[in-house]
Amino acid sequence: VWRVTLDRDGAPLLFDTIHPCGCYHQFVPTARLVARPPEPGVEEGALVVQALPALETGARVRLSIASGPHYLQRVDPVAPGAALPSDAEDYRFEHESALRALPLAGGGSASLYGPDGIVAGTERPERYALWISGIESPGAMRQWGRHATAFVGRRHFDDAFLVDRYFARAPK
């Protein structure tokens, strides 16, 4: 999952990503933000894997993703009008709501998600080690809005105050 948080003027402020289970929450702030110092205590802080320079108007970002596990490896700014590499892949976006009404062979439809928001059959072995975190089935793919992103403390991907919690405006 890749998210772009826009500033008041419509320019990118922060990029962040999670695996569809909620794990591996990584932050890539632009030059408009600086990371706040970690709060004292045992809570997981923000994992800032990279900071981007100021982006030109019209610039894009290129995501380098590992082919097997699909982990984010790097984010690079791409100048406006620059050609994409010849090996770049185009992906078609589908609205996530389509996964809640998948057509069945015999007619009707069914949701990809169970009543608990978890995708059946995506359980991973780490759930046995991380059950104590209180997160149901850690490592399993889950529905939007059900992504806990920390095993220590409380943090959710859709927290409205997430940016303010971990970042401050960079001095001008």
Name these PLM-found stretches:
Residues 9-172:
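Domain-length functional cores that host ligand/cofactor binding and catalytic or interaction surfaces
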Residues 2-10:
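A short, surface-exposed beta-strand/turn
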